[in-house]
Amino acid sequence: MVSIRPDEISSILKQQITDYDQSVNVSNVGTVLQIGDGIARIYGLDQVMAGELLEFEDGTEGIALNLEDDNVGAVLMGEALGVQEGSNVKSTGKIASVPVGEAMKGRVVNPLGQPIDGKGEIPTSDNRLIEEMAPGIIKRRSVHEPMQTGITSIDAMIPVGRGQRELIIGDRQTGKTAIAIDTIINQKGQDVVCVYVAIGQKSASVANVVEVLREKGALEYTVVVSAGASEAAALQYLAPYTGAAIAEHFMYQGKATLVIYDDLTKQAQAYRQMSLLLRRPPGREAYPGDVFYCHSRLLERAAKLSDDMGGGSMTALPIIETQAGDVSAYIPTNVISITDGQIFLSADLFNSGLRPAINVGISVSRVGGAAQTKAIKKIAGTLKLELAQFDELAAFSQFASDLDEATQQQLERGKRLRELLKQAQFSPLNLAEQVAVVYAGVKGLIDEVPVEDVTKFAAELREYLKLNKAEFIEEILKEKKLNEGLETTLKEVIKEVKSSMLATV
């Protein structure tokens, strides 16, 4: 017969009592009442927060947007083929966040920060909320450093500074993305982290951009966030905020960052789709009343931080697509009023062969002038005015038969200036090259060069400087100003290149 050992039994009971966990897992659970078009109406979830992440039975995630008396309206971030009426939904108690850090560089991710480039998981433990408060006034300082785009017409006439929001606006197929990609390529060696956010683009277009960045060696300091045209509206809506969060991480570490939102028109359309399906009241052009806030809270996150905050910066280049050049539509006017200036691309100029097709007359940079380098500021001061006057005179001269000599001279110089500012795609110029080219045009040193040879002259001038006057380029890149000695050297070089070219013409 087995003997009973009370001491052993009591010790086991004590151990069991000690190990007993009284905590209860309380989760807020609801039931799907209605589902369709990427929207779910859910009964229950009384404790849910606005913007909280929800988890459906099949693992699909959603975001609670409408908190009504008897139900919650949520948008789904995926196809959610397994979700149906009666499915259970659980609130997570979390707001959407995204992985951030050095490991993100060179990767292509979706708006949830998940890699979509086939290179495996991203080894980072840092996370950041997708929606963050913009830095306040005390945390900022005024824009004072240049963000060189490498595009002469922009750096000379519509300069962009670090921490600025400069809108790129124009019809489809006018070279908006090309300007943004050129700017990313030009940041090579500048210790700037770039984030390219593609919203509602064709997957082939995004793959093409990634390939160009890889070829030019720019992917190593760039993060690409892509929400394709086939993705859920909720993901297209979230993509820009994800890009801002990734850039913010580096900004608060004291680094300079550049974010391209390509383009916010498609984000606004995705938000309109979600809002109408959630039965929010429509406003102008059927957009919801808070579409302005949707863009303003995103673009206000771009800033130049004060030295106490580390001195980092986030420069934003949002892109807006217009219909037939109509900048007075709802979304274009909204974003123009939020940003610190706009670069307007004209379809007519593009079709006439002017690339980049920048309409200088209505393009403006409201704060970039303070950040422009002394070298380019000194010589490009009159460039914008001269080109604007040229456009006016060119239109007028079509109807006038006899023009006085001064007007003819102005027209001739304007034609040459316009030719000088033409630039091939993916070939950004450094500051010294820009200074040389603009100086030659503004000072009238190429008035004798035939208009059709101006582009060739500019290329030969740059080549000559690289081969024979490397110290000139180094000096300007180092000092960022054009002193008398450098100016004399430049005049001699221009004269030499011009005479050798005219001799062969």
Swiss-Prot record:
Annotated site residue numbers, Required for activity: S363
- What Pfam families does UniProt report for this protein, alphabetically? ATP-synt_ab, ATP-synt_ab_C, ATP-synt_ab_N
The annotated topology with respect to the bilayer is: Peripheral membrane protein
Q: Which InterPro entries does the entry mention? A: ATP_synth_asu-like_sf, ATP_synth_asu_C, ATP_synth_asu_C_sf, ATP_synth_F1_a_nt-bd_dom, ATP_synth_F1_asu, ATPase_a/bsu_AS, ATPase_F1/V1/A1_a/bsu_N, ATPase_F1/V1/A1_a/bsu_N_sf
Indicate yes or no for the key word Cytoplasm.
no
UniProt main location, coarse = membrane
Disulfide linkages recorded for this protein, renumbered to the chain, are none
Q: Where in the cell is it found?
A: Cellular thylakoid membrane
The organism's place on the tree of life at top rank: Bacteria
In terms of Gene3D superfamilies, this protein maps to: 2.40.30.20, ATP synthase alpha/beta chain, C-terminal domain (1.20.150.20), P-loop containing nucleotide triphosphate hydrolases (3.40.50.300)
Q: Which UniProt keywords apply?
A: ATP synthesis, ATP-binding, CF(1), Hydrogen ion transport, Ion transport, Membrane, Nucleotide-binding, Thylakoid, Translocase, Transport
Catalyzed reactions per annotation: ATP + H2O + 4 H(+)(in) = ADP + phosphate + 5 H(+)(out)
Enzyme Commission (EC) number: 7.1.2.2
A GO CC annotation recorded here is: plasma membrane-derived thylakoid membrane
Residues that coordinate or bind ATP? G170, D171, R172, Q173, T174, G175, K176, T177
Q: Which Gene Ontology MF annotations are present?
A: ADP binding; ATP binding; proton-transporting ATP synthase activity, rotational mechanism
Q: What family does this chain come from, according to its entry? A: Belongs to the ATPase alpha/beta chains family.
Entry-linked NCBIfam families: atpA, PRK13343.1
Q: What is the role of this chain? A: Produces ATP from ADP in the presence of a proton gradient across the membrane. The alpha chain is a regulatory subunit.
Describe its assembly.
Answer: F-type ATPases have 2 components, CF(1) - the catalytic core - and CF(0) - the membrane proton channel. CF(1) has five subunits: alpha(3), beta(3), gamma(1), delta(1), epsilon(1). CF(0) has four main subunits: a(1), b(1), b'(1) and c(9-12).
Supply the name of the protein.
ATP synthase subunit alpha
Please give the organism.
Answer: Prochlorococcus marinus subsp. pastoris (strain CCMP1986 / NIES-2087 / MED4)
